[in-house]
Amino acid sequence: MTATKPSPKSMLSLDLGKRRIGLAGCDPLGITVSPLPPLQRKSFERDLKVLQWHCTSRKVEGLVVGLPLDAKGLPTDQARHYERYGQRLARALKLPLALVNEHSSSWAAAERYNLQGDRSGQLDSAAAALLLEQWLREGPELKPVHVAAHPVSQVNSDSGS
């Protein structure tokens, strides 16, 4: 599937993990991407409350969620789980969603920001920032969640950061 460069807008990017969610946002023009403090996961309800605050305060117009595809761009079990979780969050937040290939994003973020071995969550948010930069360059366009926001089989596999 060929992705098209989306029109810039205020976005929130999520690098999902079992213990933390790395967060990054961009301005409405898509010029500045900033890592945000990571979210320490507790429960879906608490995650949602924190994300709702970010979405309201930043006037977010859509979510970008990274999926850990394998080296060939094929979905992993974890990617399928994160796709469902991202869709659940997008539905609850009433926001459109874009799914992007996050293969190697943590490695690339560790290299770029010298965060090898980080356990504070900064690496997760740095990876979320790379995912958002990738989305701003390559897409795909946001989709309403009820449209089954481009199933994992249609995520642009050329883009692993």
Swiss-Prot record:
Choose one Gene Ontology CC annotation of this protein and give it: cytosol
Pfam families with a match to the protein in the record: RuvX (PF03652)
Q: Which UniProt keywords apply?
A: Cytoplasm, Hydrolase, Nuclease, Ribosome biogenesis
Gene Ontology BP terms: rRNA 5'-end processing
> Can you provide one Gene Ontology molecular function annotated for this UniProt record?
nuclease activity
Name where it's found.
Answer: Cytoplasm
EC number of the protein? 3.1.-.-
On whether Zinc-finger is a keyword of this UniProt record, the answer is no
Give all cystine bridges in this chain.
none
Name the UniProt record assigns to this protein: Putative pre-16S rRNA nuclease
Origin species, per record, is: Prochlorococcus marinus (strain MIT 9313)
